[in-house]
Amino acid sequence: MNIKLPPFIELFRQLIATPSISATDISIDQSNESLINLLASWLKEIGFEIEIQPVPETLGKYNLLATLGRGPGGLLLCGHTDTVPFDEGLWTKDPFTLTERDNKLYGLGTADMKGFFAFIIDALRDIDVSKITRPLYILATADEETTMAGARYFAASTTIRPDFAIIGEPTSLHPICAHKGHLSNAIRIVGQSGHSSDPDRGINAIDLMHESIGHLIELRNTLKEHYNNPAFTIPYPTMNFGYIHGGDAVNRICAHCELHMDIRPLPGLTLQDLNGLLNEALEPMKQRWPGRLTIDELHSPIPGYECPTDHKMVDVIEKLLGRKAETVNYCTEAPFIQKVCPTLVLGPGSIEQAHQPDEFIDMSFIGPTRKIISQLIDHFCLSNN
């Protein structure tokens, strides 16, 4: 293909040099507009039609959908444009300067996962786009690291229906067919303050939280006993108590206590059912102490995800890679993209480097990643399969 694009390393360098941090702290949250425009300029050069959509209820966040070819089916290659914030005191390299050392590329987003777009664009150099028989779509989303607002909006609004989708998260090029979901809640209890010398004149919120945690532990045991999927290394839903705070003085009856907890459900356990179980577990406390206990979401919940391993598209990927699809315990945008078409998670780099100081991707992934992307495009967009 005779196109004017920077070399692979320069593509990578420009992606890393374009900050796109997403964070719940608005003082460090950044728009991804510059990165979206950068991708759009490259993809236009190749011949893609570009659609850029603002993501509702966000500050300066955009999705990009690039389309090459027309008709039904085809392939959707997906990635998120944002990164997590970086720990300034722990990085030994500039997070926004691509640094090559010891056969590794260092920088914020090298593995998770802005670099995936460089791999896609580089693979397209060898593709004769005039021979595309089914469409190739490239989706770049916003805010995966916080609310997954970009993927949620795309799934709810798009009209495209590809045959298959790949999300290029860092899986060490192992195909991922399922992962757990994530539900995070704040349990808040309002007591009644008073002097600690006379406990009966107050209601100690810490005591009530202690009872509530007992009910939650019973639910945790129930989840472990009744829900099981041996495909996962941790084959049951997990519950974690991650933060607790209550009281303001040793000689005062605690008037307020707050617990932050999360549950990671298996695929098949719906968020609606899980919320029902959570409310049912705490109902005795609500009945005993009316109006004193509330349950609030900390983040928008993410459902579990599973692409059936007997799906013909999964078989294609497994044969191309020579390995079976696996499961993981972390979350991706797959539950939302799966609403559009069958989806696998597959990309270069290791999840062990995600969200870490001196994030890197090993350069040994360059050749194999370019090869598998080319094979996927050939199978889903060029051949008569």
Curated annotation (Swiss-Prot):
Catalytic activity: N(2)-acetyl-L-ornithine + H2O = L-ornithine + acetate
GO molecular-function term, one example from the UniProt record: zinc ion binding
InterPro entries: AcOrn-deacetyl, ArgE/DapE_CS, Bact_exopeptidase_dim_dom, Peptidase_M20, Peptidase_M20_dimer, Peptidase_M20A
Record-linked Pfam families: M20_dimer, Peptidase_M20
EC number of the protein: 3.5.1.16
CDD domains the UniProt entry points to: M20_ArgE (cd03894)
Record's keyword annotation contains Hydrolase: yes
BP GO terms, sorted: L-arginine biosynthetic process
Location of the protein in the cell: Cytoplasm
Superkingdom assignment: Bacteria
Known cofactor(s): Zn(2+); Co(2+); glutathione
Binding site for Zn(2+) 1: H80, D112, E169
Cofactor detail note: Binds 2 Zn(2+) or Co(2+) ions per subunit.
Pathway(s): Amino-acid biosynthesis; L-arginine biosynthesis; L-ornithine from N(2)-acetyl-L-ornithine (linear): step 1/1
Assembly description: Homodimer.
Family according to the record: Belongs to the peptidase M20A family. ArgE subfamily.
Full protein name: Acetylornithine deacetylase
